[in-house]
């Protein structure tokens, strides 16, 4: 029996698995494992690339958000991306190495549905440096978008997926130190944390109607604030503080023995794939 015959019989075995069971298996796997299964057979590939399966996976994954760590190792010119859950950070842990080109400047932002914004089943990828948009399923090409925003100023910018326009959101008037402020998700609303002159941490939340650009100051949350050191400790740890319960807990992450770390919250894994045409040589 040759190799092709063995592979054919194996593919036939997979095809006999009921579709409902196959989908349930896929929904429980890490996104990286699902990506590898595309090469098992055309049958598996057609199931995994189905838009409905992607949405089901994303819905389930959204209930178990993860932490994403960006660790820089200057001596190796490398960055490592670590994905970890809060429930079992040491045992449920993924690591991916990324080679850096130090002729370029890198900025790391919290992920939003991976790297993709979705609107009415149209998937649009935004290349902010050049004001370009790529819409999947359309003409498969980058489109230039006009932007008159002054990028020399530190700004909070929104992008309207319907009108494809950039707009500047004004910061709260009482926030003086913008550079030390951070954007957070407050019950689905845009929120800004900033240190006041008296050393307290203020939480500013944008009202429901974002077009009015009105902020209110709040101190309660059903979630937690994450406090993490900028530089690696041995072992690396961060503090989760529950504003409602006024309690804190320490979470230790093993194996981050490098130089610099940046922590992003609410990372959600997704098996959504980008077509090769939307990626440049540097991506």
From Swiss-Prot:
Xref: Gene3D superfamilies: 1.20.1280.50
InterPro entries registered for this protein in UniProt: F-box-assoc_dom_typ3, F-box-assoc_interact_dom, F-box-like_dom_sf, F-box_dom
Leader peptide range in chain numbering: none
Organism domain of life: Eukaryota
Domain F-box intervals: 11-60
SUPFAM superfamilies xrefs: F-box domain
SMART domains: FBOX
One Pfam family linked to the record: F-box
PANTHER family (UniProt xref): BNAA05G37150D PROTEIN-RELATED, F-BOX ASSOCIATED UBIQUITINATION EFFECTOR FAMILY PROTEIN
Designated name of the protein: Putative F-box protein At4g29970
Organism expressing this protein natively: Arabidopsis thaliana (Mouse-ear cress)
